């Protein structure tokens, strides 16, 4: 059952509205690469997080194989993408997303030379590939991360990042705020499951949102006491804040009888994070002195579902909102519909 989002109040707009709104073959074929199944995940290098890409990258990487092999490879990656889109429609590969983000922001004057990025992702280390991609575009970002992508940096944190921005000769500054929760959806399509480098067996993401899941059933039954706004557990501050924000975002009557599944919780988190980020930006940014953008979505980790078969670890993003304000003029961008995708060759070269 879909969750009603009617209780989530949409933040007022910034500026004036301008809506631009497999298994490896037993014997290798000539010209192909044989990949052996990994039996013991704990033997994987911990820094392998830097090697993840989206599906289009992997499609092109086998350009030296036979046509039949190439077709099988493309079919495999298309199936992986279809699995992700069953849960998060409109999702695209991480490389694809980064390419489009850089191009679209460049159209509005945001570049690595004149802009500072602020990243609000989950503290989980598997969010690193996406963050590294943003660093490649804008240089090192101001880190305002929090559990599940719920920042606790507040106005002081955002203000610190803005004070580090490059400045034009006329004194104008530019900021891009990235904010999103994350979720694992393994290669078989099971939400929440992933395999981590250096750790044998199955792991999960996002752990904070998985911990939160049962609370919605408690809320539905009337047995959940929501923490008062502005208060937190001093021994568990970030989780207690995200729990209060999430549970306050829905009415008990809107929660399905069986509670919320992890995909629903993640989508709700995206909505709540959007609202909170817009509130922070509105309270801290002066559009007369700077240009800025807010980019939200869901980061999705598509890793293998078994250690007995080889399945490449891939990263996806479901874009949900992109708001750009330049000289006080607001533009809402549909990233997928309005920004051309890179060619496979471009992705591979990048």
Name what the model sees in each region.
Residues 41-116, 122-124, 139-141, 147-175, ...:
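Divalent-metal-activated hydrolytic enzyme cores
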Residues 26-28, 110, 135:
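Sterically constrained small-residue positions within well-ordered secondary structures
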Residues 1-6, 29-51:
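N-terminal mitochondrial targeting presequences
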Residues 1-27:
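N-terminal chloroplast transit peptides
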Residues 177-179:
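N-terminal, polar/Ser/Thr-rich
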Residues 127-129:
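Short N-terminal binding/cap micro-motifs at the start of the first secondary-structure element
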Residues 132-140:
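Short Gly/aromatic-enriched secondary-structure transition segments
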């Amino acid at each position: 059952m879909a969750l009603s989002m009617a209780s989530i109040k949409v933040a007022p707009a910034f500026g004036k509205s301008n809506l631009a709104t497999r298994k490896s073959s037993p014997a290798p074929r000539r010209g192909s690469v044989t990949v052996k199944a990994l039996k013991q995940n704990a033997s994987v290098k911990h820094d392998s997080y830097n090697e993840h890409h989206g599906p289009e990258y992997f499609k092109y990487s086998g350009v030296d194989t036979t046509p039949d092999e190439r077709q099988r490879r493309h079919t495999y990656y298309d199936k992986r993408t279809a699995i992700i889109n069953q849960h998060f429609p409109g999702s695209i590969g991480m490389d694809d997303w980064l390419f489009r983000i850089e191009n679209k922001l460049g159209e509005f004057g945001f570049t690595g030379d004149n802009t500072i990025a602020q990243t609000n992702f989950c503290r989980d280390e598997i969010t690193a590939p996406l963050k590294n991609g943003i660093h490649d575009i804008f240089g090192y970002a101001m880190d305002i991360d929090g559990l599940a992508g719920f920042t606790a940096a507040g106005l002081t944190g955002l203000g610190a990042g803005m004070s580090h921005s490059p400045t034009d000769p006329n004194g104008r500054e530019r900021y891009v705020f990235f904010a999103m929760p994350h979720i694992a959806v393994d290669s078989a399509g099971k939400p929440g499951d992933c395999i981590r480098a250096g750790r044998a067996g199955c792991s999960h993401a996002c752990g904070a949102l998985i911990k939160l899941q049962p609370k919605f059933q408690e809320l539905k039954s009337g047995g959940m006491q929501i923490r008062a706004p502005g208060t937190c557990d001093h021994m568990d501050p970030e989780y207690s804040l995200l729990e209060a924000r999430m549970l306050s975002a829905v009415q008990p009557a809107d929660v399905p009888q069986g509670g919320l599944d992890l995909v629903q919780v993640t989508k709700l988190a995206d909505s709540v994070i959007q609202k909170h980020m817009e509130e922070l930006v509105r309270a801290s940014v002066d559009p007369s002195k700077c240009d800025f953008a807010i980019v939200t979505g869901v980061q999705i980790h598509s890793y293998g579902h078994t250690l007995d078969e080889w399945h490449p670890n891939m990263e996806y993003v479901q874009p949900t909102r992109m708001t750009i304000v330049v000289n006080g003029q607001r533009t809402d961008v549909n990233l997928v519909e309005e920004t051309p995708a890179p060619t496979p060759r471009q992705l591979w070269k990048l």
